Amino acid sequence: MKTITKIAIQKRAGRYSIELDNQFAFGVAESVLIKYGLAKGRTLDEDLITQIKYDDAIAKALTIALNYLGHALRTTKQIKQKMRDKAVDEDIQAQVIAQLTQLGYVDDQNYANHYVATKKLITPKGPHVIRLALQQAGVAENMIEQALATYTFDEQCSIATKIAEKLAQGYQRESTRLRQQKMVQGLVNKGFSFETAQLVVDSMNIDNNAEDEQNNAKRQAEKLWHRYRHDESQQRFYKVKRQLYAKGFTSELIDAALLSLEQEEV
């Protein structure tokens, strides 16, 4: 048996140093101090000391988790990883998660629901990107499905249309076909299905008028014509023509652009 000879407040708020038989033995959280009624003069056996230290380890891990939760919602996996980074034993992690779950501080379904709502309203993303992020956060598939069920097809199309409108502004110098392809790919990259992306882009009136399409073809042709300026004339001609086809311009526009360039060099 050992006797508590001194209890002192540590610099860290809510922490106390315990001396047994005039020697520092361990530190405890205030909650542990109160739980075990630790006071000067009390005697402790080894089993009780072990239990006190174990409960204090839980208290410290709980503080780590609560501080982490203070900044944002977290999943069970994320909180466990945070404790693991702080070298918290797995059995203590389990104890902390159980307490947090009971208190309602950890709820993976609530996290998933909130995440989907945020990605619809604040930082728009499609369901595929959202699903991947939730999977990486450790949310169970059934919870992901339940959360994504609130993301209706009409909402997806509405959000995708707004994103596509912004994308369209960045591709004004492309051919209509390439512009559409890049918009579809942009929406897919944002997490929308190819079918949804194609449907949205097809529903938008983004065709360049004839003059814009002609100017775009001429502009692209000039760049390519300059790039291949050291090639032989025929090889240069076919390289530029092939590149313009790949960029989605029609043969009529390509021929007109190349004819104009050849005439300028005469």
From Swiss-Prot:
Biological processes per GO annotation: regulation of DNA repair
Residue intervals passing through the bilayer: none
One Pfam assignment: RecX_HTH3
Broad class of where this protein is predominantly found: cytoplasm
Keywords: Cytoplasm
Cytoplasm as UniProt keyword: yes
Subcellular location: Cytoplasm
Keyword hit for Transcription regulation: no
GO cellular component, one term: cytoplasm
NCBIfam families according to UniProt: PRK14135.1
PANTHER family, per database record: REGULATORY PROTEIN RECX FAMILY PROTEIN
Record family assignment: Belongs to the RecX family.
Role summary: Modulates RecA activity.
The protein's name in its UniProt record: Regulatory protein RecX
UniProt organism field: Leuconostoc citreum (strain KM20)
Lineage of the organism: Bacteria, Bacillati, Bacillota, Bacilli, Lactobacillales
Gene name in the database record: recX
